[in-house]
Amino acid sequence: MNKQRIYSIVAILLFVVGGVLIGKPFYDGYQAEKKQTENVQAVQKMDYEKHETEFVDASKIDQPDLAEVANASLDKKQVIGRISIPSVSLELPVLKSSTEKNLLSGAATVKENQVMGKGNYALAGHNMSKKGVLFSDIASLKKGDKIYLYDNENEYEYAVTGVSEVTPDKWEVVEDHGKDEITLITCVSVKDNSKRYVVAGDLVGTKAKK
């Protein structure tokens, strides 16, 4: 085999490998979005579990990659509701407690004994730095944007009051503040776990779910 042929084969192999490396993140992102859509469709008309939430320290959970999100299996026994944010086209299951497994499939509760529409309803979600996947888009929310929670009986409507950036030790953001509100928390990026984006919103209405 002459040198020219060897060079050609090596060049082709490098091209193929390069294409795979470049294309894999896009493929994983597509699969993650597809899995998320399937999860939402699966929970939209199901009977949700009771609000029996527990505290799990999510700060000790490693940041997953898109392939892990795409391959995660939704545990329907953990689903207690659904969250919808129309302004960023977000639709996710709400799962009880921020376990590693639950955070791969949707938004997860942060505190013990959380009840939708009462006190500070806090939810955590991964920022995958990929539009349309989990909590990647919540930092772009604006004051007045609507957030909707759903359980078996009701739709809870919240209006965003602000978005801030805090360090992970600022647990006061999820504490009750004497009003009915919502708090959404995520890392600032898939590569940066040193700070959190925090979205705050006030409850503006509750009505029976259609």
Swiss-Prot record:
<dbReference type="InterPro" id="IPR005754">
    <property type="entry name" value="Sortase"/>
</dbReference>
<feature type="topological domain" description="Cytoplasmic">
    <location>
        <begin position="1"/>
        <end position="5"/>
    </location>
</feature>
<feature type="site" description="Transition state stabilizer">
    <location>
        <position position="196"/>
    </location>
</feature>
<dbReference type="GO" id="GO:0008234">
    <property type="term" value="F:cysteine-type peptidase activity"/>
</dbReference>
<keyword id="KW-1133">Transmembrane helix</keyword>
<feature type="topological domain" description="Extracellular">
    <location>
        <begin position="27"/>
        <end position="210"/>
    </location>
</feature>
<keyword id="KW-0645">Protease</keyword>
<keyword id="KW-0378">Hydrolase</keyword>
<keyword id="KW-0812">Transmembrane</keyword>
<feature type="transmembrane region" description="Helical; Note=Membrane anchor">
    <location>
        <begin position="6"/>
        <end position="26"/>
    </location>
</feature>
<protein>
    <recommendedName>
        <fullName>Sortase A</fullName>
        <ecNumber>3.4.22.-</ecNumber>
    </recommendedName>
</protein>
<dbReference type="Pfam" id="PF04203">
    <property type="entry name" value="Sortase"/>
</dbReference>
<keyword id="KW-0472">Membrane</keyword>
<comment type="function">
    <text>Transpeptidase that anchors surface proteins to the cell wall. Recognizes and modifies its substrate by proteolytic cleavage of a C-terminal sorting signal. Following cleavage, a covalent intermediate is formed via a thioester bond between the sortase and its substrate, which is then transferred and covalently attached to the cell wall. This sortase recognizes a Leu-Pro-x-Thr-Gly (LPXTG) motif, which is cleaved by the sortase between the threonine and glycine residues. Important for growth in macrophages. May be critical in the early stages of inhalation anthrax.</text>
</comment>
<dbReference type="InterPro" id="IPR023365">
    <property type="entry name" value="Sortase_dom-sf"/>
</dbReference>
<dbReference type="InterPro" id="IPR042007">
    <property type="entry name" value="Sortase_A"/>
</dbReference>
<keyword id="KW-1003">Cell membrane</keyword>
<keyword id="KW-0788">Thiol protease</keyword>
<dbReference type="GO" id="GO:0005886">
    <property type="term" value="C:plasma membrane"/>
</dbReference>
<comment type="similarity">
    <text>Belongs to the bacterial sortase family. Class A subfamily.</text>
</comment>
<dbReference type="GO" id="GO:0006508">
    <property type="term" value="P:proteolysis"/>
</dbReference>
<feature type="active site" description="Proton donor/acceptor">
    <location>
        <position position="126"/>
    </location>
</feature>
<feature type="active site" description="Acyl-thioester intermediate">
    <location>
        <position position="187"/>
    </location>
</feature>
